[in-house]
C-alpha cells in the first residue's frame, strides 16, 4: 500500500549529527541523505515509492512488526512470522557516513537495495569487488558501498537473501571512487564489530546529562516525549559546525496532493534559535552555545545582519529547483529542493536569535561570551533601529510584504535583549527610545476595536499574538491581549489544536500548526490556567506514535501530522511549554 501520513506514527528517526534517516516498521529506509543533512538524497522512497530508491530488509514470509528505540538514535525493529522472529538495530555511526543494519534472526530475510544519484534511480554503474557491492554515480560524484557481513546469496539484480543468524548490512558513502581507495578499505567487519555499542555509548553520554525529571509531577506522562524532543533536536544538529536544521526531510506536503511542499533541511535562524533556547533550558548549554556561535559567525556587517536560512556549513541557499523525476509524497507536486524563503526579508529573526542569546546568558552568566560578541549584538540592534519601519514577509514567510505586528514585536525584543546584554557587560543601552517608539507604533497601528490585528488596517487576527506575552512585550493579563486571546480561542482553536490563520495567498489554511498550540499552552501557564495548558500537551501527545516524534502541521479531522517530519522547533516549543508550566505553577 502507498505511504500516507497515517503511517508516520510508526516511523523512526535516527541521526549521527552529520545526516539522518527515517525508517518504517517494515524495515524500509524511507529517507537518507549522504554525506550530510542537506545533500541530495541517496534514498527518497518517501517521495516516490517506484523511483525514489529502496533499502529494505524484511522477512520473506508474512510478518508483523514493532518499533522501539534500543537507545536514542538506535532504532530496533522486531519482526514476527509463523516460523520465527528477527531483530534489526538500525543506526548511523557518529562521525562517519556509514549506515549499519545489525541483524539477529531466526529466519531468512530479503534485502533490496537500489539507490538514487542526482534524484534518478539506476543512475549508477554497478560492480562487485572483494564481497562488496559498489554503486558509482554516473557523473563520478559519489560512491555507495554495500557490504553484507554474514551468510547471504544474491537472488536478483539488486536483491539478496540473508540467511538466519547474526548479520551486519553496512552502507557506506564516499565522495568518489578515488576517495574510497584511500579511505574505504579501512572499513571492515573487525573495526565495525563494536559499532553498535559505541553508538549507544555516544548517545548515552547525552542521556546521562539530563537533569530535568517530571517524575512525581502531574507532567509525568510527558517524560518520554520530553526526552525524545531533546534527542530529536540533538539529532538535527550538524556536529562539525553546531548548526541545527529545521527538519530532516524535503517536500513532505502540508496538504496531501497539494503544492505546499518545502525543503526544510536547512538552518533557519528562527528555528535554530528556538531550539538553542530549549537546549539551554534543559541544561545543554554547550550545544545551545554552539548553535548560537554558528549564527553569530553568519552576521553580515554590510547589510541586514542575518539571512533567513543557511546550509549546515553556513553557505547560502540560492533559490529552489523542481525535481521532475520524483512523483512526490501522495503525488504532491512539485518536489522542491532548495528554498526561496532565503530571498525574503524577515525582520523577526534577529529578535528570536538575541532572545536565545539572552536565555543562554541568564542561565550561565557567561559574560565572556557576550563580550566576545558585543559588536555583533550592537550591530544587530543598530541595524534594526534604523530599519524597523520596513515591511517584511513575517514569520509565516508570506509572499505579501506588510508591516506585521509580530515582526515589530520581535524587533522590540531584539532591542530589549540587546540593551540588557550590553548593560550586563558595562555597556550603554542606547536603544530605549527606539524600543518605546516601536511599542507605541504597535499600540497605535495594530489594535482595532480593542484587540491586536496582524498588520495595520487588517481585520485579521493570527496566532502570532500568542507569543507577545511569552517574549515579554505585553503583560499576559493586559485587556487588549485577553480580548485578542478570546478571538484566537473562538476562531483559530479547532478540535483541540490551534491554526496559524484562516487564509493566505495560496488559499484556506487547512491544518493546525503545532507551534501555535505550544504557544497557547505557555500563555495558559502564565494565566494559571494549568489544566487547559496540560490538555493542549495531551492533545499533541495523543497524536504521536511509539517513537514520540512530532510533525509541524496537524490534520485535525484525520488526526495525523502533515508536513516535514520530525519538526525541530515544535519539539523545542514542547520543551519550553513543559518548563513554562513547571515554572508558572
What is each stretch, according to the model?
Residues 1-585:
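Acidic, mature catalytic/reactive cores of soluble proteins
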